Amino acid sequence: TNKDPDNFIRTTMLINTLNFAFTDFDTSIKYSIERDGQKLSDSEAMFTQVNEAIDSGIDLLNGEVLEKLTIEELEKIFEGNIKMPMLKERVEILNLVGAKLVDSYEGDWLNFIKNGPRKLYANGEGLIERLVLEFPRFDDSSIYLDKEVNFYKLAQLAFWGIHGELAHSDYFRIEDME
């Protein structure tokens, strides 16, 4: 949908915010949609529907929209073979992410990214360090044997995706990625 690098970054951050739990826990049925005779499931279905919503004029890349998004609006975006699993949690996460973007970054993921060094780790100021601190959705750490273990998979995937797509153009390159 977005050839524009700024919107690619915004979309990637949005997708990574929503990228979890696509199977109904009770029935084990995967969330899926059909487009052009093809069945799309899991994150592929979600990605397609996010882009369709954006193309239809729903500005999911804007923190102000995310902050006020309702479960009814998200249900309309994610119409599939079953109700999107964990829809209530997704709305809560999007509302929190939107509120943080509005409060601290004028509603825009780009301002979050521009607010620090282009490094994943930089004495607490790196992209991953700030993302997991400021956006709890991305903080996938646990306690194991009385020690904190940090995975940061979602945060890493977000920035790997952006870096992989845009590093060749020098538009967005993370200094400590390789």
Predicted regions and their residues:
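HhH-family (HhH-GPD) DNA N-glycosylase catalytic core used in base-excision repair
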Residues: T1-E178
